[in-house]
Regions:
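Histidine/acidic-residue-rich, glycine-tolerant segments that coordinate divalent metal ions
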Residues: 1-94
Length: 101
């Protein structure tokens, strides 16, 4: 027997909820560093824009879930929790970091 205290659940407060079979999943953290080429915002053709790559990756992660996995067999979620890159509004950065689970 085992008991878990959950911080994210739909169960009513003050009650004990249970179910038979699997009911939780693991969180597997990941971190990606995207390396591009910095350029001034007025000359985007001189850059390899890691921000655009990060946008596309975030969108495409959802395709993995909806098109590559049979969710009846293996429920899954991919979440992007943070995206960090750049320090100036008019400079395309050289590096962007993404993290999630």
């Amino acid at each position: 027997d085992v008991v878990f205290g959950l911080h994210v659940t739909n169960a009513a407060h003050g009650l004990i909820a249970y179910r038979e079979g699997a009911s939780m999943a693991a969180a597997d953290p990941w971190k990606i560093t995207i390396k591009g080429r910095q350029a001034h915002g007025s000359r985007p053709w001189d850059s390899i824009d890691p921000i655009m790559v990060a946008f596309q990756m975030g969108n495409n992660f959802q395709t993995i879930i909806s098109r590559k996995l049979d969710l009846r067999e293996s429920p899954a979620v991919i979440s992007v929790g943070s995206i960090h890159g750049g320090v100036r509004s008019n400079i395309i950065p050289a590096v962007v970091e993404m993290e999630g689970t």
